Structure formats: C-alpha cells, structure tokens
Amino acid sequence: LWYYDNREDLKKVVRLHGKSTERDFYVGEKHRDEIIAMDTNHEGFPDSVHGYSLKSDRIEFLKGNNPENANYIAKFSELNTELCHILSSRNNALAQLYPPDGHISWHNNANASAYNIIFSWSETGDGCFKYIDGHTGNEVVMQDVKGWQCKAGYFGAYGEPWYNRV
C-alpha cells in the first residue's frame, strides 16, 4: 500500500497517462471486438491506459531533473524485488496506480505470454477485470471488492490469446 498511501505525492511528480474521457470506448464491446478481429495483427499491448506507470522502466516524471525522481525509482525497485522474492518470480510485467476513472484497454498480452499473478487493491470495489475465456469464448467479469484481491491465470501467445481489460 506504499503507493496508495503516497498517492497525493506521486500525483505531483509522476505523469498521468491517457485520458479518462476515452475509457468507455477502450473498455467497451466495440473496441474489444476490433482487437479480437485483428488476431495476430494485434501486438499484444493495450492501445490506451489511464493511470500512473510505476515500473522503473516505464515511469515518466513531470520534471526530468527533479532529484526526488531517483528516490521513487529506488523505492519501486525495493518493493518490486521484495515481491518477486516472496513469489519466487523472475519478472514483474506491470505496476500501475489507477485514478478512480482509470483503465487499461482491451488487449491480449500475446507478446508476453506467461502465467500471471495480479494483485490489486480497491478503495471502493467499483472496478473490475474482464477477460474472454480462451477456451469457451465467453466474457468473464471479476468484480473488485473493497480491499485486496488476487487473480491468477495464464495469458497465452498468439494461437491461444486471452483478451483482457481493467
């Protein structure tokens, strides 16, 4: 919860990606269907994200020459290393802090297929994780609850894509 506890300070130094006004389109059925129709022409990454990227190789600061930037990167590295050790994980693909109207658009992760563990914390329980079950083709909604939740699963490569959005 360090990021959540320090969210007001983070907002002053970390760039907020994307626009909340785009959310309905990018998490909607029309965009989902467009991404699925692209098949292997979809590169795997989401087209739109509205949130703060916190991973050290993706974080963007509002001021590039702020001496505090190094402290944020060091803190992320410390927390990321600790989490990877606890989980016996080699990589962490994503670390995001979403504003109340945040999102990640429909995508398939086929460019980085792997087993995933997704930890999220919700203040209100209003968010959700949606995915298309790669075996049945059905859309599944995993509604957030207040507090912590954990989701685990396999995001497949091309030929077995697992379309999802937050």
Regions found by a protein language model. Name each.
Residues 6, 41, 65-71, 80, ...:
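Detector for Asparagine
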